[in-house]
């Protein structure tokens, strides 16, 4: 039995995005984020490796990590947020774990992820 009220479930189902591509930890993705600067809005791309996914319906989120000027940057995005314009998968990674937090300690060639073939 579900712990959420039926009305709440229906409201959440309306807000779910339908155009979210299938991606998993280890994949390299480009996330287009809406950024508001003053009175104008633009898209900003954030490209990196998905190190974690959290699947909770409307509260689903994923964490993307990239190295910018030698410094590791991680951003967590809400999958169904209006701020996230699009998610594009650039390359599929071949990993065995669901959470890739160990990449935080690795640098350079050690932090590379094998590409999934086939």
Curated annotation (Swiss-Prot):
The keyword Ribonucleoprotein applies. InterPro entries: Ribosomal_bL19, Ribosomal_bL19_CS, Ribosomal_bL19_sf, Translation_prot_SH3-like_sf. Transmembrane segments: none annotated. GO terms for cellular component: cytosolic large ribosomal subunit. Pfam families: Ribosomal_L19. Keywords: Ribonucleoprotein, Ribosomal protein. One of its GO terms (biological process) is translation. PROSITE patterns: RIBOSOMAL_L19. Signal peptide: none annotated. GO terms for molecular function: structural constituent of ribosome. NCBIfam families: rplS_bact. PANTHER family: LARGE RIBOSOMAL SUBUNIT PROTEIN BL19M, RIBOSOMAL PROTEIN L19. Belongs to the bacterial ribosomal protein bL19 family. This protein is located at the 30S-50S ribosomal subunit interface and may play a role in the structure and function of the aminoacyl-tRNA binding site. This is Large ribosomal subunit protein bL19. It comes from Saccharophagus degradans (strain 2-40 / ATCC 43961 / DSM 17024). The gene is rplS.
């Amino acid at each position: 039995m579900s712990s959420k009220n039926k009305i709440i479930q229906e409201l959440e189902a309306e807000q779910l995005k339908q155009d979210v591509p299938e991606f998993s930890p280890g994949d390299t993705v480009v996330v287009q984020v809406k950024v508001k600067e003053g009175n104008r809005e633009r898209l900003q791309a954030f490209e990196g490796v998905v190190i974690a996914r959290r699947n909770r319906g409307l509260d689903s989120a994923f964490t993307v990590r990239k190295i910018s000027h030698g410094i590791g940057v991680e951003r967590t995005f809400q999958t169904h947020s209006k701020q996230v314009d699009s998610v594009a998968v650039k390359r599929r990674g071949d990993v065995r774990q669901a959470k890739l937090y160990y990449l935080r300690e690795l640098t350079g060639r050690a932090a590379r992820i094998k590409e999934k073939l086939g």
